[in-house]
Amino acid sequence: MNSIKFPVLDRTTKNSVISTTLNDLSNWTRLSSLWPLLYGTSCCFIEFASLIGSRFDFDRYGLVPRSSPRQADLILTAGTVTMKMAPSLVRLYEQMPEPKYVIAMGACTITGGMFSTDSYSTVRGVDKLIPVDVYLPGCPPKPEAVIDAITKLRKKIAREIYKDRIRPQQGNRCFTTNHKFFIVRSPHTGNYDQELLYPPSSTSEISTETFFKYKSPVSSHELVN
């Protein structure tokens, strides 16, 4: 596996002082302290669970799974994302502190997978809900591919500039036309507008009183005949 190149240190002064910038020091400290929030909804998450074992030992990368989004700086989505789960995913992402990163793992997360062909409730790409930093294709991806995706994310962190990363979130989030979603406001407050995600049904309900009022009586003789 390729090692991460971090050419930010000034090596002109030997054996005594290391000169660098605050931005480079911040990036270096975050390389080995990625705390992921595991968002698994389908079979792809089983492949990620195998990383916890001694064979792959993902602890060497400083990955410490967290159960709270407020303690995580990386969310790893694995599996199919449905319309019902979309508000929960957006809320979890908004509750994560900056800077935060997203890895989309598996075909179902990236494009909707095989469920997107005939399913009305499948979100065709998690990037329509939250910004994605690393795409990890596969059905499902191997654990080695997950390690490679984490390595690429660490390389991206090593090169980024802090002021560019702390940018305003997307003002609007556009959903696919097939889902009949609408453009919604930025959910920075954590209060997701449920009415925009679940529009009222076009069919109106008939009350019980109205149903029995206009229902014509049918005798047992007519029912038999």
Curated annotation (Swiss-Prot):
What is this entry's stated membrane topology?
Answer: Peripheral membrane protein
Keyword Membrane in record: yes
Q: How is the cofactor bound?
A: Binds 1 [4Fe-4S] cluster.
One GO cellular component term noted in the UniProt record for this chain: respiratory chain complex I
Pfam families per UniProt = Oxidored_q6
User: What does the record give as EC number?
Assistant: 7.1.1.-
The name of this protein is NAD(P)H-quinone oxidoreductase subunit K, chloroplastic
Organism of provenance: Capsella bursa-pastoris (Shepherd's purse)
